[in-house]
């Protein structure tokens, strides 16, 4: 995947997570106060009225945006750090998902305010897991190993 495609997908994931927030989350969130100060609440109110026919699940409302944003961060960092050594790229790209995982685990242990949610933990973990699998497949040419093994065994 090229850096440009990674960036585009990353920006689309940010947009999708943002649209979920704008469409369905309570307007008491800090985001809406900022949008109100920018004079955008009339537009947002109209958008929310149009979207009111839809009733997404709690997973979509509360867990999915974090996972989308974690995945977006990974993709954008990978696109911006193309000439950086692989270990540094992975370390930087892992920061946000690891922070999300840590915050959920600390909530579970009662060491951080908030409510532990296993689906939030899953949504932060999956993008990181996909990153690791992607790096293994791309950089260690694992598919070549499998195809070579199948040719040798025949």
Label each residue range with its predicted role.
Residues 1-154:
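Bulky hydrophobic segments
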